[in-house]
UniProtKB/Swiss-Prot annotation:
HAMAP family: UPF0227 (MF_01047). InterPro entries: AB_hydrolase_fold (IPR029058), UPF0227 (IPR022987), UPF0227/Esterase_YqiA (IPR008886). The gene is ycfP. The lineage of its organism: Bacteria, Pseudomonadati, Pseudomonadota, Gammaproteobacteria, Enterobacterales. Belongs to the UPF0227 family. This is UPF0227 protein YcfP. Pfam families: UPF0227.
């Protein structure tokens, strides 16, 4: 089972395309939708939905995937639910760059302070990070500097922030999922 979390643009047709691409790895791909506008509510909702899916799951090696803001959540929810994560161009600093787009961006900073202390150290090697060198929305170099101590970083030379085509990375993702 692969759980997919969309980014800020929840209505993007690219979400459906990514789900279809992920089905080449595992036919059981589940999209969880969330508001993107209310961080604390989103966290509760995502934890509840992922936990529900894991309770009904028969896959011994489930995976959670997210793009952009979905990558922010996939890393945290995956850690809290003890499943491996694959994150594409994760938005690690939504409290800095989501002002005016969401109701309370400061809630992201609050969530960060309430999360398990040093969670990335405890999550070491359980997350695969795929970054675009052509990310027009986020500073992928800053993201790499933040995460490379803990996770493998894979660079993509062609995709933009929304990462429309993940197919060149499917074999790597499948291998990572298999490690479970």
């Amino acid at each position: 089972m692969i759980i997919y979390l969309h980014g800020f643009d929840s209505n993007s047709p690219g979400n459906h395309e990514k789900v279809l691409q992920l089905q080449f790895i595992d036919p059981d791909v589940r999209l969880i939708s969330y508001s993107t506008r209310h961080p604390k509510h989103d966290m509760q909702h995502l934890l509840k939905e992922v936990d529900k899916m894991l309770q009904l799951n028969v896959d011994e090696r489930p995976l959670i995937c997210g793009v952009g803001l979905g990558g922010y959540w996939a890393e945290r929810i995956g850690f809290l639910c003890d499943i491996r994560q694959v994150i594409f161009n994760p938005n690690l600093f939504p409290y800095e760059n989501m002002e005016g787009k969401i109701d309370r961006p400061e809630e992201y900073a609050d969530i960060a302070t309430k999360c398990v202390t040093n969670f990335r150290e405890k999550n070491r090697d359980r997350c695969l990070v795929i970054l675009s060198r052509n990310d027009e929305s986020l500073n992928s170099q800053r993201t790499s500097e933040e995460l490379h101590h803990y996770y493998e970083i894979v660079w993509d030379e062609e995709q933009t922030h929304k990462f429309k085509n993940i197919s060149p990375h499917l074999q790597r993702i499948k291998a990572f999922k298999t490690l479970g």
